[in-house]
């Protein structure tokens, strides 16, 4: 593994670590402190301000028009639309279902990459993807608890749409990611996302029969009437700074160095990370499935990387 590949793997591990931490945090935010639309708007706005500030401190980078279109459209699909689906999914179902469905992301990416950018599906690559899915599913299933969400069927459907749109983003922005800095890409991604996230959120509200379809919703978030806003503000700060700015900085950084399928395999780290953190803070116990799941996910990433570097891959 050369230095660029190592940097790509390290970046995507960091990104999926914070993404794994963000699932229970988002679940708490959209069920207690924000509406899904309010959550997405403030998340987009915060990330936009930070990325444009960072861009102002860096040398200006010119983006070709066709590449800018790919970045903007891909970003709107991969962030504004995908994460809105995710926020609504977590408002209707439990994080465990969401984590289970997220393990299907590498399959979606592999199939889309084969269909649209002619990335071959080799036997070794398929085996690697399946090993990673097995590792993540092992831990999710072993940690299954009773109880249901508000509407699990609807939540699961929205989670599937979230993973599909995220997979589309990984595939269509793969080549462009190698041409421009992550900050340049993300400043346009989040500016476009901030513009469309509320209209798309209103569309979701109207379709789901939830929330208020006007700007007054942003002025009436549950957080504003809480006796102490500190916890909700701290959680939102974590989502904006770590799960959005840091996480989405490292994704294009990684995609410039390793294939989209390899990037997607690391999605299976998210439930592993969530479980490790729960154990560390005393909310869970260490059982045999957790280290086994972690080893399987890392083995999966190694196999897919080896397969991608073969001449016929």
Located regions from the model:
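C-terminal-most transmembrane helix of multi-pass membrane proteins
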Residues: 1, 44, 141-142, 232-234, ...
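Glycine-/small-residue-enriched transmembrane alpha-helix faces in small-molecule transporters
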Residues: 1-42, 149-175, 195-199, 313
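Juxtamembrane helix-entry segments on the extracytoplasmic side of multipass membrane proteins
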Residues: 4-8, 33-37, 41, 63-69, ...
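Specific transmembrane alpha-helical segments of multi-pass solute transporters/efflux pumps
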Residues: 18, 22-23, 52-102, 138, ...
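Hydrophobic/aromatic residues within transmembrane alpha-helices
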Residues: 29, 39, 43, 89, ...
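Helix-helix packing/entry segments at the starts of transmembrane helices
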Residues: 41-42, 79, 83, 97-104, ...
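Transmembrane alpha-helical segments that form core, pore/gating elements
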Residues: 51, 109-110, 148-209, 213-217, ...
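Hydrophobic transmembrane alpha-helices of multi-pass small-molecule transport proteins
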Residues: 51-52, 72, 112, 121-143, ...
């Amino acid at each position: 593994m050369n230095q660029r590949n190592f940097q790509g793997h390290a970046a995507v591990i960091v990104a999926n670590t914070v993404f794994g931490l963000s699932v229970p945090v988002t679940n708490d935010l959209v069920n207690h402190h924000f509406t899904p639309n309010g959550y997405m708007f403030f998340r987009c706005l915060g990330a936009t301000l930070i990325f444009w500030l960072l861009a102002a401190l860096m040398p200006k980078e010119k983006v070709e028009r066709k590449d800018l279109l790919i970045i903007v459209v891909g970003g709107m699909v991969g962030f504004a639309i995908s994460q809105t689906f995710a926020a609504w999914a977590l408002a209707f179902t439990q994080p465990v279902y969401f984590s289970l469905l997220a393990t299907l992301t590498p399959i979606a990416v592999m199939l889309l990459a084969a269909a649209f950018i002619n990335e071959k599906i080799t036997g070794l690559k398929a085996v690697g993807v399946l090993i990673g899915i097995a590792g993540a599913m092992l831990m999710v299933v072993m940690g299954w608890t009773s109880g249901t969400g508000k509407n699990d069927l609807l939540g699961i459907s929205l989670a599937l749409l979230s993973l599909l749109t995220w997979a589309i983003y990984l595939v269509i922005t793969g080549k462009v990611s190698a041409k421009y800095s992550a900050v340049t890409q993300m400043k346009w991604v989040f500016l476009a996302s901030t513009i469309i996230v509320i209209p798309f959120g209103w569309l979701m509200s109207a379709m789901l029969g939830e929330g208020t379809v006007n700007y007054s919703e942003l002025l009436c978030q549950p957080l504003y009437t809480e006796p102490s806003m500190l916890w909700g503000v701290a959680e939102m700060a974590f989502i904006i700074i770590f799960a959005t700015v840091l996480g989405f900085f490292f994704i294009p950084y990684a995609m410039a160095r390793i294939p989209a399928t390899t990037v997607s395999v690391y999605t299976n780290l998210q439930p592993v990370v969530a479980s490790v953190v729960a154990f560390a803070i005393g909310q869970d116990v260490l059982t045999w499935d957790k280290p086994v799941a972690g080893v399987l996910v890392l083995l999966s990433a190694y196999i897919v990387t080896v397969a991608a570097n073969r001449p016929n891959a």
